[in-house]
Amino acid sequence: PWKENKMIDIHSHIVFDVDDGPKNRAESKALLEEAYAQGVRTIVSTSHRRKGMFETPEDKIAANFSEVKQLAREVAPDLNVVYGAEIYFSSDVIEKLEQNIIPKLNGTRYALIEFSMNTPYRDIHSALTKVLMLGITPVVAHIERYHTLENDEKKVRELINMGCYMQINSSSVLKPRLFGDTYKFMKKRARYFLDKGLVHVVASDMHNLDNRPPYMSEAYELIAKKYGAEKARELFETNPSKIINDQLI
């Protein structure tokens, strides 16, 4: 009953040979096919930009992206892929955003920003303040990763009240496995944020079909069951649609 074919995925690694996502065209296409089968119809490509780790030249990412756009047309005529970036915050990011060197999400006011798991709250707060001062609206990637935000409604609300939006990964929505679930703590955090109404978007952060596939349909179903169909639509369709169309949430 929860099958939705209008999902919009604003966090994905679908471009081959540019980061830790797909290695080649075939892997890119396999991801696109799986996402489409799950009901995703628009994917924002957010390859990593991270100083010292993922430093693929912008023109190479753009060139490979245009090939992925072509692959999407082969997968299905109604599968839409648009351009973006997952931006790991470092001191040089502000200048690069200001000069439009690194892309925002589909050319909108929204930018997907990530931090390391151990980044202190004051650094997250100050980084997001700097981004906001450029007139850019941060979407904070996978908030369930950051230790400083664990069980801390007050901090997350503060970031939201500043004007930021919060994203969690679909993999973190899944039920924890009984044994050997390395990511159990992230699933607990994600559930806390959902319970408190602190999540604006669920997205896949898919990298490959082996260990980081999209779990969009599964996550959609779980959220629809637990929080209602309207909430599921809001997190997987309505809000992501507003983001890629440069509208306010």
Predicted segments with their positions:
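Short acidic/histidine-rich active-site segments
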Residues: K196-P213
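Mid-to-C-terminal alpha-helical segments outside catalytic/metal-binding sites
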Residues: M216-I249
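Charged helix-capping and loop-helix junction motifs
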Residues: N24-E27, K60-A62, K96-L97, N151-R157, ...
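Active-site beta-loop-alpha junctions enriched in small/polar residues
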Residues: H13-V15, D19, H48-R49, G84-S90, ...
